[in-house]
Amino acid sequence: MSQYRTFTAQDAVEYAKQFGGLDNPSSLVEAQEIGDGNLNLVFKIFDAQGVSRIIVKQALPYVRCVGESWPLTLDRARLEAQTLVEHYQHSPQHTVKIHHYDPELAVMVMEDLSSHKIWRGELISGVYYPQASRQLGEYLAHTLFHTSDFYLHPHAKKAQVAKYINPEMCEITEDLFFNDPYQIHERNNYPAELEADVAALRSDDQLKIAVASLKHRFFSQAEALLHGDIHSGSIFVAEDSLKAIDAEFGYYGPIGFDIGTAIGNLLLNFCGLPGHLGIRDAAAAREQRLTDIQELWNTFSERFQALATEKTRDAALSVPGYASQFLKKVWTDAIGFCGTELIRRSVGLSHVADIDTIKDDAMRHECLRHAITLGKALIVIADRIDSAEALVARVRQYS
């Protein structure tokens, strides 16, 4: 049995030779550490011609951006690998392929996506992938439907819930989404110029009650196997292609959480675009984001309902009209969770480049305020926004 050790670049090369599944493993000669996230080491493995062939990812036993003072379970590597393997079974065209994983070393070997680019960077630059939102909707529909009560036998579903219990990573989400932004906490991160805006979050009882309701659903609604962190930085895109990666927050939770997180990141980009592009280009890109949001939800809901009509196994859940009713609740959840994503990415520990890389301080602060104001509104009035078109109208109202 393997014993955990932190990989060096050479360790990653040797591991890729053994478990990468390549026809000519001896061609692998060099590794480059490319991880820019908070939790892991990520190595690109190159052959003698300088071509990247495979990826080796290893979990660290602490939060990288904080240090060893914030320890983390290594079991998250198993949960991430198993989540991606499960999602790949249901949406292979939109999920990164895992070739091998070792739970003792907390390491996995996965396909190289050098032909793709991280969606967040492309969104910031104003590069438009018209298929991406629809493909993300397809990914979410297939992965969430096929791991839900609509499709799984009750015994299998309960076994899956137990298999994917992920308490330490869920606790991070619970703190960063639902606790920290609404109290004074050392993890919070925002400019002094926003102190009044953040203080208003802490004093808004109506908002905090709505956030408590969302947190309660996150605690208790084991509806499907979530990706758990499906933002534009955990999605790779290319022409006519989209792949989800980075699922260490995977667990059984409310379907609306994945939908809301995805929509929230599109709205964070919407808020930040005036700080990156000229007036006309920013306005055009903002319209694209609003179209993306509508296409994401409409694709997801149409595909989920089609799958429910075709494949639902439970007699009660297969009653005509129930899937549509269920999705109305998912949508309301999604709007609320979307709002928490907007707020926590503006005042909490982990921000997004869509806003944080804006060079002009005044513009950056204005974009942060926009995200906070929009997030508050969506959380509080989620049950009054009954469609993607209604959401777009609300976003325009707060722009």
Curated annotation (Swiss-Prot):
SUPFAM superfamilies: Protein kinase-like (PK-like). Pfam families: APH. It comes from the Bacteria. It catalyses: 5-(methylsulfanyl)-D-ribose + ATP = 5-(methylsulfanyl)-alpha-D-ribose 1-phosphate + ADP + H(+). Its EC number is 2.7.1.100. Belongs to the methylthioribose kinase family. Catalyzes the phosphorylation of methylthioribose into methylthioribose-1-phosphate. This is Methylthioribose kinase. It comes from Enterobacter sp. (strain 638). The gene is mtnK.
